[in-house]
């Protein structure tokens, strides 16, 4: 199943978090937090003004992004857990 976001929504794949600390300690799965970084998998066309004019998206497929801890809604596409969120939930693009 393919999923294309509508309007100003973005489909994001979380990046894997580190399994070791800087000191070399291994972090068990039960203690890991979900990462707040990800890669944009798909984008909608953008939001529309009241006049109908299209507001272009600031992110594109393949961008590495930073988002809020509680942002988005988890969706499963082809057995893979992804996040669907509004573009406004994205805090920035990692360059």
UniProtKB/Swiss-Prot annotation:
Keyword line: Chaperone, Cytoplasm
UniProt function note: Together with the chaperonin GroEL, plays an essential role in assisting protein folding. The GroEL-GroES system forms a nano-cage that allows encapsulation of the non-native substrate proteins and provides a physical environment optimized to promote and accelerate protein folding. GroES binds to the apical surface of the GroEL ring, thereby capping the opening of the GroEL channel.
Source organism per UniProt: Ruegeria sp. (strain TM1040) (Silicibacter sp.)
Similarity field: Belongs to the GroES chaperonin family.
One CC-aspect GO term: cytoplasm
Compartment(s) where it occurs, according to its Swiss-Prot or TrEMBL record: Cytoplasm
Protein name per its UniProtKB record: Co-chaperonin GroES
One of the record's GO molecular function terms: unfolded protein binding
Top-level division of the source organism's lineage: Bacteria
HAMAP family: CH10
